[in-house]
A protein has these predicted regions:
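Short basic helix-loop element that most often maps to the first helix and adjoining turn
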Residues: 2-17, 21, 46
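Conserved functional loop/turn residues at catalytic and ligand-binding sites
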Residues: 12, 17, 33-36, 63
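Residues in the helix-turn-helix
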Residues: 17, 28, 58
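Recognition helix of helix-turn-helix/homeodomain-like DNA-binding domains
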Residues: 23-38
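DNA major-groove recognition helix of helix-turn-helix/homeodomain DNA-binding modules
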Residues: 42-58
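Short amphipathic recognition helices of helix-turn-helix/homeodomain-type DNA-binding modules
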Residues: 58-64
Length: 64
């Protein structure tokens, strides 16, 4: 499990918007958000650019 869904919703994005902004398919984005696929380095970097105040550990590993 990760905090990606929570972060996305807090910032007013839907899954389609996030997938488009990250340059991935909706299906891939959904799998990562649901914890059914691991995020690659580029995916993590793009998320960090979109949400610079959140740490990678918080977003993907639920660590403060």
């Amino acid at each position: 499990m990760n905090n990606l869904r929570e972060l996305r919703k807090e910032n007013g994005f839907n899954q389609e918007q996030m997938a488009a902004e990250l340059g991935v398919s909706l299906s891939m984005y959904q799998k990562v958000e649901q914890g059914n696929a691991k995020a690659g380095r580029k995916f993590m970097e793009k998320i960090k650019q979109r949400f610079p105040k959140a740490s990678i550990d918080y977003i993907f590993f639920c660590k403060q």
